[in-house]
Amino acid sequence: MAFFNRIFGSKTASSDKNSQITHSDNPKVKYLRQLFSQAKFRRENKCFVTEGVHLLQTAIDAQRLPEKIFVPQSLLDNAEVLGCLKSCANIQPIVLSDKIAQSISSFKTGFSIIAVFRLPENKVLPYCQDCVILDNVQDAGNVGTILRSTAACGIKNVLLNKTCADAFSSKV
């Protein structure tokens, strides 16, 4: 959390307005790269990233707003991106040059809007709720498939032990 505040400052930092990140040495770019690639860094900072308009819109629809939003310069006039930004009007978007966005992106081709979210708090589940427990599922793709399947079945609680792949990896 302290690292997040040191990099980003307040939620409406005026230095973000009308500026574009164009250099890979920018601390915000380094922070994003680490969130994308390092599970330990995500846990320590209690944050994770999503990439893409549809993931962000799904989070917004579920009443989960991001801490920060990064928008590639070429997508500033995209209708879907503008819709997401309107839904998150209190969050000042940070503009990335397309070159920087491409270098950060987990997509094989292209790039999209990136949002930084706080990790949800771990909580004790009531005894009567259905849940799925994962033990030693080490492939992130398999974890993602199981998470999507449980959601499709209406199961809202999934427990992963420490030997499982990180559920907040971009590969899930």
Regions found by a protein language model. Name each.
Residues 2-75, 165:
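Boundary-proximal intrinsically disordered activation/regulatory segments immediately upstream
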Residues 39, 95-96, 127-132:
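Glycine/charged-rich beta-loop-alpha catalytic/anionic-binding loops adjacent to active sites
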Residues 49, 70, 114-116, 132-133, ...:
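Structural motif
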Residues 52, 115, 150:
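Residue-level signal for inorganic ion chemistry
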Residues 61, 121-172:
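RNA substrate-binding interface of SAM-dependent RNA methyltransferases
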Residues 78-89, 172:
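Short, aromatic/basic amphipathic alpha-helical patches
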Residues 93-109, 113:
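Glycine/small-residue-rich loop that forms an oxyanion/phosphate-binding "nest" at active or ligand-binding sites
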Residues 112-122:
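Short, structured interface segments
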